[in-house]
């Protein structure tokens, strides 16, 4: 028996190379709207979304790359994982990283190759559209769960329309830059 939802979930994985193909804004709007059926505490839907393409995505990319290339980092608004990370999770992350580097032919001992790989994050891996999700400043863990449900719906909705995705924490290393380029207040 075939189940389209399960098939879509099983097909979802991170893409790190995208076609130079325009994505109709109507599809993105439809997916974002449908994805809002995700559960959130008291139906608060505490997120905001910015959809970037064209000159806006180029401006953000260029601005972050200029800082990245000079080893200038900002403080992320939130910590992504525990510090220190437990051995079981560290081992999983290493295995994933080793497999990715092997697949891409990256020598793990080459700082230059690793830096170029990391640099691709700020080029959004060539994606023609970037969707950035925001939560209010001082959000709590539950708000992150709510937004995570929404983000997963967005990724699955896009995939069901033939559009792959790659969620990225790396750009969260530049929260002030993102807010500046996108004219967001410090409250987000």
Features from the language model and the residues they span:
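Acidic, surface-exposed loops and disordered segments
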Residues: 1-188
């Amino acid at each position: 028996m075939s189940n389209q939802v399960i098939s879509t979930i099983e097909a979802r994985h991170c893409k790190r190379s995208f076609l130079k193909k325009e994505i109709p804004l109507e599809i993105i709007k439809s997916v974002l709207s449908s994805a809002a059926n995700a559960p959130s505490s008291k139906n608060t839907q505490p997120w905001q979304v910015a959809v970037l393409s064209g000159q806006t995505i180029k401006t953000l990319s260029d601005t972050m790359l200029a800082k990245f290339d000079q080893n200038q980092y900002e403080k992320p608004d939130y910590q992504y994982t525990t510090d220190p990370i437990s051995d079981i999770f560290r081992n999983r992350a290493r295995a994933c990283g080793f497999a990715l580097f092997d697949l891409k032919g990256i020598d793990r001992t080459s700082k230059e190759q690793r830096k170029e790989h990391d640099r691709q994050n700020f080029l959004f891996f060539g994606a023609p559209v970037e969707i950035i999700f925001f939560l209010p400043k001082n959000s709590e863990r539950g708000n992150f769960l709510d937004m995570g449900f929404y983000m997963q719906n967005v990724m699955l909705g896009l995939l069901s329309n033939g559009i792959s995705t790659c969620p990225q924490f790396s750009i969260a290393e530049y929260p002030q830059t993102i807010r500046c380029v996108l004219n967001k207040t410090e409250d987000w």
